[in-house]
């Protein structure tokens, strides 16, 4: 079981939460990015650098993730592919993507892309709040408890 991070767009504060969690859980944490990343020394934490390019990191995460893994991403298509493989998916704001919600999220994403393509300014997400950080940490802990229960 591994935690995969779409690290190019993942906020540093979320990475810090993940570093501490990987140590506490003794769970492999892999940060996938198209640039060099500095991570704390740990036998549980590693980086995987991929070539620059559209969806290269996403495709590598999909290729390597397995059922039971956790994927951290704000990229909805990546989350959908991870869920199809049986992995769990969580965004940096603490929202857990599920098979029941991912289709709706994909539809909304496509709708917003259509609006932007037609010239309508849709704006971006708000900056990450303390509440978002707490929600992320709580949802990560919830996932970990589910993992422990499934192991018996």
Swiss-Prot record:
Alphabetized InterPro entries for the sequence: UPF0178
PANTHER family registered for this protein in UniProt: UPF0178 PROTEIN YAII
Family the UniProt entry places it in: Belongs to the UPF0178 family.
HAMAP family xrefs: UPF0178
Record-given protein name: UPF0178 protein YaiI
Organism: Escherichia coli O1:K1 / APEC
Gene, per the UniProt record: yaiI
């Amino acid at each position: 079981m591994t935690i995969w991070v779409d690290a190019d767009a993942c906020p540093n504060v979320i990475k810090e939460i993940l570093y501490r969690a990987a140590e506490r859980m003794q769970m492999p944490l892999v940060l996938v990015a198209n640039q060099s990343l500095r991570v704390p020394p740990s036998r549980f934490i590693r980086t995987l650098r991929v070539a620059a390019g559209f969806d290269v990191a996403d495709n590598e995460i999909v290729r390597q993730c397995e059922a039971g893994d956790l994927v951290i991403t704000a990229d909805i298509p990546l989350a959908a592919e991870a869920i199809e493989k049986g992995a769990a998916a969580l965004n940096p704001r603490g929202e857990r993507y599920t098979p029941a919600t991912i289709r709706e999220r994909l539809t909304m994403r496509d709708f917003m892309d259509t609006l932007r393509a037609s010239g309508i300014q849709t704006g971006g997400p708000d900056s990450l709040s303390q509440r978002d950080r707490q929600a992320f940490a709580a949802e990560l802990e919830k996932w970990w408890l589910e993992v422990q229960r499934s192991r018996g």
